[in-house]
Design a protein with these regions (language model features):
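Short His-centered aromatic/hydrophobic patch
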Residues: 103-109, 130
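Conserved donor-binding/catalytic core segment of Leloir-type glycosyltransferases
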Residues: 159, 200-218, 224-228, 241
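Glycosyltransferase donor-sugar binding loop
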Residues: 54-56, 239-253
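Donor nucleotide-sugar binding/catalytic pocket of nucleotide-sugar-dependent glycosyltransferases
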Residues: 128, 150-193
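Conserved acidic donor-binding segment of nucleotide-sugar-dependent glycosyltransferases
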Residues: 329-330, 334-342, 349-356
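Nucleotide-activated donor-binding/catalytic signature segment of Leloir-type glycosyltransferases, i.e.
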Residues: 244, 252-276
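Short hydrophobic beta-strand element within catalytic cores of glycosyltransferases
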Residues: 305-310, 314-317, 327
């Protein structure tokens, strides 16, 4: 969607302040989304400043093309972090009231739900992005739904990361439908993948790779169980590699137990830095992230599927949430219904046995990953900064 603008060239857009709880060195799709939208907005010509949680001790700041202000808070979704974020926003209300305030994720959104009732923080423009799971959480309780509806009325533009998230949002907050734009994610700017060899030499290890935080919603357990049901000949050369930080739940224990029962190696590689991920992708043959419904959480899109595609890997995933917008069944990967363990095993078996299919899906994945840009998404949400949009 392209925004229309006034022809009065004296009305430049106000500075853009992006406030997020998830930013470097935090890992994950939302942290990437926040950083790349800031980078793209700066590239469009906006004066961008990102407000993010304090760096951990010993971690140096990256060289960003925009300003970064570190706030004295941890950046989780706990009540203390929400209170501290609210205090920071209130303390800087004069700056924010003269700026475009962009909230790209649910952390600071919760603080905004509280501050809106004081009517002291009134940014020149308020822009919001929703990813999926938070939509269900905000709609699940009457007070939260009411507060969110009130805040949405103040937003001039609302973006969602997938058509699935758009439909979910309109289902729960139909009044805001006219404000919605679609802002798909794209590849990280610093990603320069080396394509893997999709047809490993005879006798070589067949590596199945998952890159995701270790969490029930990411489906690592479902992958292990599906791989255990493969024919013995395919399991003989199989390894399953899991990249991702450990969960705070008891999921680690369940995964370790499942891995111990497998007759093939399951390697937990931990939280691998971005600069070392390329080598891991290059050794893999198939990428798998079989997202599962977990409480109110759902996969709204999945940037990591694009990253796997950029490395030329065919994808095995569940047909859930916004995943089909990142992975096209039969074109860039194979999709299976959640809970269909036999179907998941069959998908893995088909790809392991068919190098030509892997090459075809991998090539299509590389093409798909290159077609989306952060600039397009930033343009849809922010518009050009040379004139102020007549919202």
């Amino acid at each position: 969607m392209t925004l229309s603008f006034s022809t009065n060239t004296d009305r430049r857009a106000p500075p853009l302040v992006l406030v997020t709880h998830e930013f470097f060195p935090h890992r994950g799709g939302i942290a990437i989304y926040a950083a790349e939208m800031a980078r793209a907005a700066q590239g469009l010509g906006y004066e961008v400043e990102v407000w993010a949680p304090a760096l951990p001790p010993g971690v140096a700041e990256k060289g960003w093309p925009f300003k970064v202000r570190r706030l004295p808070l941890a950046g989780d979704h706990g009540l203390l972090s929400q209170w501290r974020m609210a205090r920071q926003l209130e303390a800087q209300r004069d700056q924010l009231n003269a700026a475009t305030l962009y909230i790209p994720e649910p952390g600071p959104l919760l603080a905004m739900l509280l501050l809106q009732y004081f009517d002291r923080l009134q940014p020149a423009r308020l822009l919001l992005t929703f990813h999926g799971s938070e939509i269900q959480r905000l709609a699940s309780r009457r007070l939260l739904r009411w507060s969110t509806t009130h805040l949405l009325r103040k937003a001039v533009r609302i973006s969602v990361v997938s058509a699935y998230a758009r439909d979910l949002f309109i289902k729960h907050f139909p009044e805001s439908a006219p404000k919605i734009v679609l802002t798909h994610g794209a590849l990280r700017t610093d990603l320069a993948p080396s394509p893997p060899d999709p047809a490993p030499r005879a006798g070589a290890t067949t590596v199945i790779l998952t890159v995701a935080r270790i969490n029930p919603r990411k489906g690592q357990l479902q992958v292990i169980e599906a791989l255990k049901a493969l024919p013995a000949a395919q399991r003989a050369s199989l390894e399953y590699w899991v990249v991702g930080s450990h969960s705070k739940e008891n999921y680690d224990t369940a995964l370790a137990a499942a891995a111990a029962r497998a007759d093939f190696p399951v390697k937990f590689l931990g939280d691998v830095p971005d600069e070392k991920l390329d080598d891991i992708y290059r050794q893999a043959v198939i990428f798998a992230m079989t997202s599962m419904p977990h409480n109110p959480s759902v996969e709204g899109f999945g940037l990591v599927y694009l990253e796997a595609g950029a490395h030329g890997l065919p994808v095995v995933a569940h047909d859930i949430g916004g995943v089909p917008e990142a992975v096209t069944h039969g074109e860039t990967g194979l999709l299976v219904a959640p809970g269909d363990t036999a179907g998941l095993t069959a998908a893995f078996s088909q790809l392991i046995a068919d190098p030509a299919l892997r090459r075809r899906l991998g090539a299509a994945g590389r093409l798909r990953a290159s077609q989306r840009t952060w600039r397009d998404s930033a343009q849809s949400l922010f518009g050009q900064p040379d004139t102020a949009p007549p919202f």
